[in-house]
Amino acid sequence: MRLNELRDNDGATKIRTRVGRGIGSGKGKTGGRGVKGQKSRSGVAIKGFEGGQMPLHMRLPKRGFNKPNRKAWAEVNLGRLEKAIAEGKIDAKKPIDADVLIAAGLVRRALDGVRLLAKGELKSKVEITLAGASKAAIAAVEKAGGKVTLTAVADDAAE
């Protein structure tokens, strides 16, 4: 077998039908679209329209709601915090707060506050002051000999 003998398997590629190329082609003039009407025009595909039948998105019930005053937390996991300390981006001997995390590039914006989560492992002894933290994250920091201080007064800060 040589490179010039390589070819696709039979049926692997389908030849595109060229429509609107004369009546002799069998797909000329209207190009398989029928005559007149909305669907014969170009650029028409009505998303969600089912020919007058009640569309699926309207047949299904409404569910849930969006909490108007929900907090948007910026989240930091213990594993990323430990990695930043190991890389020298954060000094573990100094207190860590939202500004330190932003400067180190762990968080882009503080939003409604920074929240510490327990994914990963923390080996360094650190003193952290943040708006919120999960119970597992607080336990992990205290197990490593550190301390977590929460600044947010919100009910959902320490869940």
Swiss-Prot record:
SUPFAM superfamilies: Ribosomal proteins L15p and L18e
DNA-binding recorded as keyword: no
Biased composition (Gly residues): 21-35
GO biological process, one term: translation
Segments for region (Disordered): 1-41
GO cellular component, one term: cytosolic large ribosomal subunit
Annotated GO MF terms: rRNA binding; structural constituent of ribosome
Residue ranges, compositional bias (Basic and acidic residues): 1-13
InterPro entries (alphabetical): Ribosomal_uL15 (IPR030878), Ribosomal_uL15/eL18 (IPR021131), Ribosomal_uL15/eL18_sf (IPR036227), Ribosomal_uL15_bac-type (IPR005749), Ribosomal_uL15_CS (IPR001196)
Keyword annotations from UniProtKB, A to Z: Ribonucleoprotein, Ribosomal protein, RNA-binding, rRNA-binding
Subunit structure: Part of the 50S ribosomal subunit.
Function: Binds to the 23S rRNA.
Annotated family: Belongs to the universal ribosomal protein uL15 family.
Protein name: Large ribosomal subunit protein uL15
